[in-house]
Structure formats: C-alpha cells, structure tokens
C-alpha cells in the first residue's frame, strides 16, 4: 500500500512537472514565433513605403516631362505665330511704300466690303463649329456615363426584355451632330473658294493695266523711231539741197500733227478705246484666259481633293475605329493625318507656283516678240504727256525758224544746233522710258512676290489656329473622359473595400466564437479531472482507514499536499486563461495586419499595372516615333536627292549663262570698238569735208554736183552703219538684262531649297532627341521594374498564399523576358 501511494504521489508529481514543461514550451514557441512575424511585417511595410516613394517620384518626373513637352509645344507655336505676324507687318509696310493713294477705285472698295463680309461669315461659322463640338462632347460624356451606370444591369434588362431606347436616342443625337458638323465644314470650304475668286479678278485687273501701259509705250517708241529716222533723213538732205527744205517743213508739220494725235490718243487710251493695238490685246487676253482657266482648274482640283478627303475622313467605319481608340492613339492618329494634309498642301502649292512661273515666262516671251515693255506709273505717263506739248511747241518754233530760213537763207548753224538739241532730248526721253519700264517691271515683280507671301502666311496662320482649336477641343474631351473613368474606378474600389471589410468582420466573429467554445470545453475537462481525482482520493482514504488506523497522520499530510497541488493547478488554469485571452488579441491584431497588407498589396498591384501600362504605351510611342522618323528620313533622302539634282541643273544653267554673259560682254566690247572707230572715221570725214569747203570757198571754185552727191552718199552710208551698230547694241543689252534676271531667279531658288533642307534637318534632330529622351525614360522604368521584381521574388515563398501578387510577378517576368529578347533579336 505504501508503494502505490508513493507511485500515485510520484505520478502526480510527474504530471505536474509535465504540465509545467508543456506550458513553458508553449510560451517559448509563442515568443519565438512572435518575433519573425513582426519582423516580416515591418520589412513589408518598409518595402511598400520605398515602392510608394519611388512611384511618387516617377509620377512627379513623368508629370514634369509632360508639362515641359506641352510648354515647349506651346512656346514653339507662339514663336511661329509671332514670326508670321512680324513678316505680315513688314510686308504690309513695304506694300504701303509702293502703294499710291490716287489709284484707289470703286473696285477696291467693293473688294474690301466683300472681304469684310467673308471674314464675318467665317467667324460666325467658327463659332457655330465650336458650339457643335461642345454639344458633341457633352453628348459623348452623357453616353459614357449612361453606359457605365447601366453596364452592370444590362444583362438583367435584356433578360427581362426591356428596351434600350435612351441609348438609341442619344446615339441618334450624336449622329445628327456629326451630320451638322459635316455641313458646316462643307460651307467653310465653299466660302474659302469664294474668297479665292476675288484674288484672280484682281490679278486680271493688274494684267490689263500692265498691257495697256505696254501698248502705249510700244506706240510711243514706234513714233519716236519714225521721228528720229525722219530727222536723220532731213539732216542728211539738208546739207545737199536747200530746195528740199520746204518738203522737210511739211514733214515736220506732219510730225506735229501726229504728236497732237498721240496726245489725244493718250486721253482716249485711259478708257481702253485704242484701235491700232487689237492684235496685241488679243494675244494678251488669250494668255489671261489660259492663266485663269488653269487657276480655276487647280482650285477645282483642290476643292475636289478637300471634299474627297472630308468625305473619306468621315466614314462610319472610321468613326467606329476612332471610338475604340485610346486617347494617345487618337492624338497620334490626328497628328499623322494633319502631317499628311500639310504635305499634300505643300506639294500642291509647289505645283501652283511652277505653273505661275511657266505662265510668266510665256508672258515675257510674248512681250519680247511684240516689242512692248512696261511703262512707269501714272506719274511718269503724266510727265510724258506734259513733255509732248513742249515738244510740239519746239516743233512750232522750228517751223517758224525754217520759214525764216527760207525767206533769208542764212541760219544753217542755228538749225543744226536745234536739231542736235532735239536729238538729245529724244535720247533723254528714250532713257527715261527705259528706266521707267525697268522700274515698273521691278515693282510689279515685287508686288506679286509680296502678295504670294501674304497669302502663304495667312494660310499658315489659319492652319495653326485651326490646329490649336482642335488640340484644345480634343484635350478637353480626353480630360473629361479621364476624370469620369477615375470617378468610376474610385466608386468601384470603395464598393470592393466595403465588401472586404464586411467579410473580414464576419470571419473575425466566427473565430472569436470558436475560441470561446474551445476555452469552455477545456475548463469542463479540468473540472471533471479534479472531481475524479477527489473521488480516487476518498476511496484510497477509506481503504487506508479500514486497513490501518495508524497511518491517519500520513494520510492527513497527503491530503494537505493534494490540496496544495489542486490550488496550484487552479492557479495554472487561471494563468492559462489569461494567456489564451492574450493570444486571441494577438490573433486579431495579426488579422488586422494581414488585412492592411492585403489592401496595400491590392493598391500596389494596381500601381504596378498602371506602371506596366505606361511602359507599354511608352514602348508603343517609341516604336511609332521610330517608324515616323524612318519615314521622314526616307522622304528627306528622296527630297534631298531631287533638290540636289535641281541644284546641279541650276549650277549647269548658271555656268552656261555665265559663258553667254562673257560672250555677250566680248561682243559688246567689239561693238564699242567698232563704234568708236566709226565715230573717229566720221569725225575725220567731217573735218576733211570742212577743210574742203574752206578750201573751195577760199579758191572761189564751182563745186561739181557729182562731188556733192558722193559726199551725201558717204554720209548716208555712215548713218546706216551707226544705226545698225546702235540696234545691235540695244539687242545685246536686252539679252544681258534677261540673262541677269534668269541668274537672279536661279540663285533665289537655290537659296530657298537650301533653307528647306536646313529646316528639315533641324526637325529630324529634334525628333531624334525626343526619341532618345523617351528611350531613357523607358530604360529607367525598366530598371525600376527589375528592382521591384527582385524584391518581390525574394519573398516569393511567403507570397504564394496571395495569387494576385503571383500573377503580377508573372506579368513582370514576361515583360522583362520580352525586353531582354528584343535587343538581342
């Protein structure tokens, strides 16, 4: 019996020791497990904070880059507009210098009124188009909101058989707005073509003025040539036979009458009623008809091209593709189309300029064949009109003096002096006419060039303004759409967050209930154990009393020991309850931490998706820009080859023209030498004639008529030779002036082509710099992705319990593997 008691005592003691050791082991494990969880969560928090900081930095950098690009584009546009405004102001000032206030007619006033009306109508059309665009944007935003709100309940409506009438009505309204925009664009094109018509009318009016002045100058030249020839004939016949003086007087009177008729014809010629120049006018009118027909044909082709482009650009299939495009793709698409339109426009402008140059060449050829040149302005014509009566008065004086000479027969020297003065005046008039013609041609060319520059600058300004307005409208549309998408995503994330919160609250309640049940069952088991132990002790006590009354003291001691053990067990149970409560609190805290970690992971997942989308967009932009740059390089290479060929052709032309100039100069020198020799011979013959006359007078001999006739024949031959040499010199001067004009034109074309090449090279350099910047951004973002992937891959065994993060890791791995393969391929 003693041994059993000892065993029981030993067993109880051993049980007590086991419980203590188990409790100590549990506490140690908990303490050991608490530290790594906390460290892991702290590492995750620090890692996510680093990622957040890097993402914020990348966002700030991308926003700053985008703002810089936008400001750069705006500054470039503003600089271009300012440059064009300055050029317009300079050109207008130069035109004001050449403009004469007395030439304003009723036609110019009507043209100004027409221009004001067209400007007012164009401004009203622009306002209408702006209103229609704003209405379209509002309708599109309403449609998107309607689709987004009713997207979740669309299946329910379809299952119930409900109609989608509001969607159809809104789509119909959008179609109506598009049709109205089409009609507005067509009206704008018609108004533009109507504005182009007065410019052609003005050109015809200018050509008519130039032709009238050319005809007047041709008539004056022909009359002056006849007058000079008659004067020379009179001079040749004057020294031989004094009996012919009366005939010369009659011819001078005839010349006076012709000059009066010319003066009268000047007055009639201002109204355009001249009968002698019908053939020349017919030729010029035919040339004007050809030019106007070509301009109208080109304008009709331009209109047809614009209508075709507008009709093809507004196909419904194309509209569907535009609806499915993203904002960046839409912007790139519109930029490509605008570049194409600019290229077509520049090509057509080049064709028109070439046609204008061809017509000008034909016109110059006609002027050279018809031997009429341009006269100065109305002031110079007025000066000529004033000189004609002065010449008539001088002719009257000559007639009076000739009559006196016939009556007296002694004033030969005075007549010769007057004839010389008249010849000098005629030469001065010729020089003034030639100078006036040159000035008129220069002024007409300058005016034509300035008008072309003004038209080009106005078209460029209108294009830039239209582009700016389109950019503003498109940017507004995309901003509104982007804000709506952000609001929708925010609502969806709020709903998901509320659903997750409710689910986690339910899970926590279930866990708390389960833990309470477990603690109650453990307490009941401990109570049952204690009751069983008490019953065993009572049985043993009774048996010990029956067997031996001697061991009562030992049993009492044993009972006291048992009571102490029971008390210690109760204390241990209370301590265990406290530990269980503390563990429950720790579990709740860990669940809260897990929930926050999941939320942070979800947000970071979204951020990583956004970053990956941005990287994909940047890669697509880089690829597109590379393709565009390659296309531009190819086009520039083709254009440069063409321009180099043209430059080579111009250089060959210049060399040939220089050779012709040298030949012409040599011929001029030869002609001058011949003229000088003939003048010397004439002076010698005159001196010999005078000496012979003096000798004859001194000898008082009768001169035979044969000698007089021989002298007259010599004088006629000498006069003919001088006339021929003068005509040849004039022809050479005209050829030299034409060659100099051609050389100047070729030089101007070469300079313009060089400027175009330099501009295109600068544009290519800018595009390459932008591509380099985008490549650097892509590389930095890829480096950031690699760092994120390495950090997440380090915690891959822990993150296996989160499938969303594993999917993100797979996507990142694919992106990185694709980027590593691309440069190798």
Curated annotation (Swiss-Prot):
It is found in: Golgi apparatus; Cytoplasm. One of its GO terms (cellular component) is mitochondrion. The keyword Magnesium does not apply. The keyword DNA-binding does not apply. Its main location: Golgi. Keywords: Coiled coil, Cytoplasm, Golgi apparatus. Residues 124-147, 251-271, 410-521, 563-788 form a coiled coil. It comes from the Eukaryota. Interacts with WPP1/MAF1 and WPP2/MAF2. This is WPP domain-associated protein. The gene is WAP.
């Amino acid at each position: 019996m003693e041994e059993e008691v000892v065993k029981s005592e030993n067993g109880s003691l051993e049980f007590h020791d086991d419980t203590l050791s188990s409790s100590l082991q549990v506490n140690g494990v908990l303490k050991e497990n608490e530290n790594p969880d906390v460290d892991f969560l702290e590492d995750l928090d620090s890692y996510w904070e680093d990622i957040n900081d890097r993402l914020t930095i990348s966002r700030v950098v991308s926003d700053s880059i985008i703002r810089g690009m936008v400001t750069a584009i705006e500054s470039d546009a503003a600089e271009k507009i300012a440059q064009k405004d300055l050029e317009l102001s300079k050109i207008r000032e130069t035109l004001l210098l050449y403009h004469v206030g007395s030439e304003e007619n009723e036609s110019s006033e009507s043209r100004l009124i027409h221009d004001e009306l067209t400007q007012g109508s164009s401004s009203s059309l622009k306002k209408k188009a702006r209103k229609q665009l704003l209405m379209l944007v509002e309708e599109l935003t309403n449609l998107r909101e309607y689709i987004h709100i009713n997207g979740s309940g669309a299946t329910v409506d379809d299952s119930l058989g409900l109609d989608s009438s509001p969607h159809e009505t809104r789509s119909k309204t959008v179609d109506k707005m598009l049709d109205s925009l089409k009609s507005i664009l067509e009206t704008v094109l018609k108004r533009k073509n109507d504005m182009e018509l007065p410019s052609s009318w003005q050109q015809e009016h200018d050509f008519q003025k130039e032709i009238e002045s050319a005809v007047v100058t041709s008539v004056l030249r022909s009359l002056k040539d006849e007058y000079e020839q008659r004067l020379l004939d009179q001079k040749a016949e004057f020294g031989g036979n004094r009996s012919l003086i009366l005939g010369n007087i009659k011819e001078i009177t005839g010349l006076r009458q012709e000059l009066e008729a010319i003066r009268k014809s000047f007055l009639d010629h201002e109204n355009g009623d001249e009968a002698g120049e019908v053939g020349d006018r017919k030729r010029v009118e035919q040339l004007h008809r050809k030019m106007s027909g070509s301009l109208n044909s080109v304008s009709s082709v331009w209109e047809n091209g614009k209508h075709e482009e507008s009709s093809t650009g507004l196909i419904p299939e194309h509209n569907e593709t535009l609806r499915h495009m993203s904002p960046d793709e839409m912007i790139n698409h519109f930029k490509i189309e605008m570049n194409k339109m600019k290229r077509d426009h520049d090509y057509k402008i080049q064709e028109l300029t070439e046609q204008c140059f061809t017509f000008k060449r034909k016109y110059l050829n006609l002027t050279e064949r018809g031997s009429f040149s341009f006269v100065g302005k109305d002031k110079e014509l007025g000066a000529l009109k004033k000189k004609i009566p002065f010449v008539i008065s001088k002719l009257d004086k000559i007639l009076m003096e000739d009559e006196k000479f016939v009556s007296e027969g002694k004033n030969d020297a005075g007549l010769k002096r007057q004839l010389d003065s008249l010849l000098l005046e005629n030469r001065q008039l010729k020089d003034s006419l030639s100078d006036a013609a040159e000035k008129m041609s220069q002024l007409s060319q300058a005016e034509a060039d300035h008008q072309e520059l003004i038209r080009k600058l106005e078209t460029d300004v209108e294009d830039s303004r239209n582009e700016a307005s389109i950019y503003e409208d498109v940017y507004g549309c995309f901003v509104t759409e982007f804000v709506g998408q952000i609001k929708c995503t925010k609502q969806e994330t709020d709903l998901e967050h509320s659903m997750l919160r409710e689910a986690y609250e339910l899970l926590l309640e279930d866990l708390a209930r389960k833990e309470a049940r477990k603690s109650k069952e453990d307490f009941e088991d401990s109570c049952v154990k204690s009751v069983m132990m008490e019953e065993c002790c009572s049985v043993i006590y009774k048996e010990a009393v029956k067997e031996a009354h001697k061991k009562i003291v030992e049993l009492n001691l044993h009972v006291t020991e048992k009571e102490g053990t029971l008390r210690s067990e109760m204390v241990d149970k209370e301590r265990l309850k406290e530990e269980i409560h503390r563990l429950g609190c720790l579990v709740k805290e860990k669940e809260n931490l897990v929930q926050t970690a999941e939320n942070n992971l979800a947000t970071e997942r979204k951020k990583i998706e956004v970053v990956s989308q941005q990287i994909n967009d940047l890669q697509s932009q880089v690829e597109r820009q590379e393709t565009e740059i390659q296309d531009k390089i190819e086009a520039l290479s083709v254009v440069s080859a063409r321009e180099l060929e043209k430059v080579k052709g111009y250089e060959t032309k210049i060399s040939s023209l220089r050779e012709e100039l040298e030949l012409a100069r040599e011929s001029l020198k030869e002609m001058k030498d011949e003229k000088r020799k003939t003048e010397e011979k004439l002076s010698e013959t005159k001196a010999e004639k005078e000496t012979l006359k003096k000798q004859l007078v001194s000898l008082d001999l009768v001169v035979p008529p044969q000698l007089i006739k021989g002298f007259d024949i010599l004088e006629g031959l000498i006069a003919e030779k001088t006339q021929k040499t003068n005509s040849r010199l004039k022809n050479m001067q005209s050829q030299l002036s034409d060659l100099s004009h051609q050389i100047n034109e070729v030089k101007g074309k070469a300079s313009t082509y060089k400027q175009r090449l330099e501009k295109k090279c600068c544009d290519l350099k800018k595009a390459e710099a932008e591509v380099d910047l985008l490549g650097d951004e892509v590389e930095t973002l890829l480096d950031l992705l690699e760092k994120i992937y390495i950090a997440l891959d380090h915690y891959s065994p822990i993150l296996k319990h989160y499938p969303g993060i594993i999917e993100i890791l797979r996507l990142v791995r694919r992106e990185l593997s694709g980027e590593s393969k691309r440069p190798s391929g």
